[in-house]
Amino acid sequence: SRLLLTLATGTGKTSVAFQICWKLWTTRWNRAGEPRRPKILFLADRNFLVDDPMAKDFAPFGDARHKIESGEVVQGRDMYFAIYQAMAEDERRAGLFRKYPRDFFDLVVVDECHRGSARADSAWRDILNHFEPAAQLGMTATPLREDSRDTYLYFGNPLYTYSLQQGIADGFLAPYRVHRVITEWDAAGWRPSKDELDRYGRAIPDDEYQTKDFERVVALRARTEAIA
């Protein structure tokens, strides 16, 4: 019940996700084989990755759409959208995902699934584990490499891969040249000072942060501005 699609950035992952959800919804497919429409969750790690598809690609779902946020539990819709952070458990609250039965969703679409949800030690993984009875479709633009190995261990080998090279050859993507820039933070790493707080007043865990952590675990305003 775990499936993976790998499509290069810009080749239509969101459109493919919509078509899959739409066809399952209109044909009234569900895991139990009951005479009803499926319950589907579209899960991502940033609001714009949820809000934009919900408003545009998934517009044909109309009033069947609902975004899970602010602790509100709605169970009367069919097409749900959420970011991990809204559903996950943290030191301030129990996970909102626990308020939904384990078998509530028939399909969970995990957009940009390489961003950490498949890591065994990730709090986001708890969401996928909770909804384990559902079919889980991971979507990513990241081919198998060391920092995405957990994704492939969890979802398995891709059912279908549409590579960057294919996208360029087919005329959907423009050719490119890489210009690599190394900032001082990437070269030397970064460690917070003792008792340093983030912009929200929360303590930053004392650790050595490297390139792989930036924009995933921590975001440094000075680094972001330098790159921009």
Regions found by a protein language model. Name each.
Residues 2-20:
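Walker A/P-loop
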Residues 49, 86, 114-115, 144-145:
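Residues immediately C-terminal
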Residues 57-93:
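Inter-Walker segment of RecA-like/P-loop motor cores
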Residues 98-138:
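SF2 helicase catalytic motif II
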